[in-house]
Curated annotation (Swiss-Prot):
It comes from Homo sapiens. Keywords: Cell projection, Cytoplasm, Cytoplasmic vesicle, Endosome, GTP-binding, Membrane, Metal-binding, Neurogenesis, Nucleotide-binding, Nucleus, Synapse, Transferase, Transmembrane, Transmembrane helix, Ubl conjugation, Ubl conjugation pathway, Zinc, Zinc-finger. The lineage of its organism: Eukaryota, Metazoa, Chordata, Craniata, Vertebrata. Residues 131-631 are annotated as: Interaction with ZBTB16. The chain crosses the membrane at residues 547-567, 580-600. GTP binds at R318, D319. SMART domains: RING (SM00184). GO terms for molecular function: GTP binding; GTPase activity; ubiquitin protein ligase activity; zinc ion binding. GO terms for biological process: embryonic brain development; endoplasmic reticulum organization; G1 to G0 transition involved in cell differentiation; neuron differentiation; positive regulation of glial cell differentiation; positive regulation of neuron differentiation; protein autoubiquitination; protein homooligomerization. Self-associates. Interacts with SP1 in an oxidative stress-regulated manner. Interacts with SIGMAR1 in an oxidative stress-regulated manner. Interacts with ZBTB16 (via C2H2-type zinc finger domains 1 and 2). It is an enzyme of class 2 (transferase). GO terms for cellular component: cell body; cytoplasm; endosome; membrane; neuron projection; nuclear body; nucleoplasm; nucleus. Pathway: Protein modification; protein ubiquitination. This is RING finger protein 112. It catalyses: S-ubiquitinyl-[E2 ubiquitin-conjugating enzyme]-L-cysteine + [acceptor protein]-L-lysine = [E2 ubiquitin-conjugating enzyme]-L-cysteine + N(6)-ubiquitinyl-[acceptor protein]-L-lysine.
Length: 631
């Protein structure tokens, strides 16, 4: 049937409906229209990518830790995989899809390769935009009760600085009483170091404003030993030395107890290789008393830790009334007046490791130049002070912290070609060892000789521990084989350890020097007894397991059902004294033999041969869980 022709009115009506429909679908700009349909993307331009999640473990659903990848595509943490894998399945079965597949390198290989990438330093432009603030750090704090608090975090920040970690270090320490010009001298040294590091000379930079520097330990609530956090590399190329500045603070304060001052001297000895004792006007008795004690403590510390006691010492007399007089002559006059009272200081100053330097007071007019103006005398003082600072900084690389010759016979690590020089990391470890001794509770000391006795006893105690641990390790190695272990009953092993412990206590106890010798021996005996008990617990369990295995095998191979009686009798007769611990072994031997019986009797030779073969393989591979573990 032919379609009727559309009139003009019908055509306009249909066209209006289509336009309204398109407007409803979002092609018009009306505010009430719906959101337009998304357009079809042809993929010709860049597509926004959804953020990819980090790979997670298929078991714990957390970020992978030490990952293991399988051929099936699943990844697991090594701990999750070891916990949920099927025992005895080789190659392993995937805990998720249960497919048997091999391990592949996968994520583990990628992580290992990323660790091998070289750590590139930041470009100079970025380093300048984000500099690390250099400041004085408090290393040793004196609390309100007069005790010492060692801040290992601050020590590690300084000595393990990237410029000092693997580099020999020189520590310039300024000693002296309060108001003796320590901060003044430290600021001049600090201002001269950058120029010497860059090759422009070691004289202080700037004018009056730059001489103020920073405030070293100015806060009375934070007394102790301070160090400048940033090292300066001085010396020739290939032989650079990281130089630090150290302020000993209140180490000479008479308010502190004698024990605290001795400990501060010990820490100062470890934290210095070039000492400057700054005094005002003349050397006083307090200065000489402190210096005598400091030299004595340095000798004790050097003997115990194998370090050079005093590498270089300057006696700097500021505001001296004899600025034109030679320093050694000035010291000679002092010791003529105080002869015999300070033997160690006198011996030190007569050698080549120490010198005396004199500086005039600022503004003091020379006696033979009465017409000189104050500005001229200040210029003279600056000139002499600048010459001294330049001389000290130029000589600093020659006095890096070092050990005594012959100390390296113990087989320690080599540092930068010269085995005697200490790097920053090695010095930080030595300070940590020293803090461990200082932190122990025990009898106090009031003299360097008593401190030397405590360090001597500490060395003897550590030697006794090492000797006993070595003996236990030898017994562990000697009884790893099954038949070797069965020859030594647990009671016999216990007696061997007890005899060795008593011999060590008797031999090392005679050499102890401190008054609290009995308390030291009791503490040492308790530690040795704990080591022996830990070994005996593991040894007894291993012995019982070996005995049960051998008893069951022999009983089954020889007499079938009656072999169980033989196995039980063998275990019971061998360990009558260890009945409680070995009853399980005897029962296993009897039950196993009774059930298996004669069915395996014909395979006795093969069984024993397999046991010995497995034992040899285990010896070659080594025990996965040794009885004695070292941290």
């Amino acid at each position: 049937m032919p379609r009727p022709a559309l009139s003009v009115t019908s055509f306009c009506h249909r066209l209006g409906k289509r336009e309204r429909k398109q407007s409803f679908m979002g092609n018009s700009g009306n505010s009430w229209s719906h959101t337009p349909f998304p357009k079809l993307e042809l993929g010709l331009g860049p597509q926004p990518m959804a953020p990819r999640e980090l790979p997670t473990c298929s078991i714990c659903l957390e970020r992978l830790r030490d990952p293991i990848s399988l051929d099936c595509g699943h990844d697991f943490c090594i701990r999750c995989f070891s916990t949920h894998r099927l025992p005895g399945c080789e190659p392993p079965c995937c805990p998720e899809c249960r497919k048997i597949c091999k391990q592949k390198r996968g994520l583990r290989s990628l992580g290992e390769k990323m660790k091998l990438l070289p750590q590139r330093p930041l470009p100079p432009a970025l380093q300048e935009t984000c500099p690390v603030r250099a400041e004085p750090l408090l290393l040793v704090r004196i609390n309100a009760s007069g005790g010492l608090i060692l801040r290992m975090g601050a020590i590690n920040r300084c000595l393990k600085h990237p410029l000092a970690r693997d580099t020999p270090v020189c520590l310039l320490a300024v000693l002296g009483e309060q108001h003796s010009g320590k901060s003044f001298l430290l600021n001049h040294l600090l201002q001269g170091l950058p120029g010497l590091e860059s090759g422009e000379g070691g004289r202080p930079r700037g004018g009056e404003a730059s001489l103020q520097g920073c405030r070293w330990g100015a806060n009375g609530l934070a007394r102790g030993i301070w160090m400048w956090s940033h090292p300066f590399l001085l010396g020739k190329e290939g032989k650079k030395v990281a130089v630090f500045l150290v302020d000993t603070g209140d180490a000479m304060s008479p308010e502190l107890s004698r024990e605290t001052r001795i400990k501060l001297c010990a820490l100062t000895t470890m934290l210095s290789s070039y000492q400057i004792l700054s005094t005002s006007q003349e050397l006083k008795d307090t200065d000489l008393d402190y210096l005598e004690m400091f030299v004595h403590v340095a000798e004790v510390m050097g003997k115990h830790y194998g370090m050079v006691p005093i590498q270089h010492l300057d006696l700097l007399v500021r505001d001296s009334s004899h600025p034109n007089k030679a320093g050694q002559g000035h010291v000679g006059n002092i010791f003529q007046r105080l002869s015999g009272r300070y033997p160690k200081v006198q011996e030190l100053l007569q050698g080549k490791r120490a010198r005396c330097c004199l500086l005039p007071a600022p503004g003091r007019r020379r006696m033979n130049q009465g017409h000189a103006s104050p500005g001229d005398t200040d210029d003279d003082f600056r000139h002499l002070l600048g010459a001294y600072v330049s001389d000290v900084l130029s000589a600093a690389p020659q006095h890096a912290k070092s050990r005594c010759q012959g100390y390296w016979n113990e087989g320690r690590a080599v540092a930068r070609g010269d085995r005697r020089l200490l790097t920053g990391q090695q010095l930080a470890q030595e300070i940590k060892n020293l803090s461990g001794w200082m932190g122990r509770t025990g009898p106090g000391f009031t003299s360097p000789d008593e401190m030397a006795a405590q360090l001597h006893d500490l060395r003897k105690v550590e030697a006794a521990k090492r000797e006993f641990e070595e003996y236990v390790r030898q017994q562990d190695v000697a009884t790893k084989r099954i038949f070797s272990a069965l020859r030594v009953l647990p009671d016999t092993m216990r007696n061997l350890l007890s005899t060795q412990k008593d011999a060590i206590l008797a031999r090392h106890g005679v050499a102890l020097l401190c008054k609290g010798r009995d308390q030291t021996l009791e503490a040492l005996e308790a530690e040795l007894q704990a080591t022996a008990k830990a070994f005996m617990d593991s040894y007894t369990m291993r012995f019982c397991g070996h005995l049960a295995a051998v008893g069951g095998a022999v009983g089954a191979g020889l007499m079938g059902l009656a072999g169980g009686v033989v196995g039980a009798g063998m275990a019971a007769a061998a360990l009558a004294a260890e009945a409680g611990m070995v009853a399980a072994g005897a029962a296993v031997g009897a039950t196993g033999a009774a059930v298996v019986g004669g069915g395996v009797g014909a395979g006795l030779a093969a069984t024993v041969g397999c046991m010995e073969k497995e034992e040899d393989e285990r010896l070659l591979e080594g025990d996965r869980e040794p009885l004695l573990q070292e941290e």
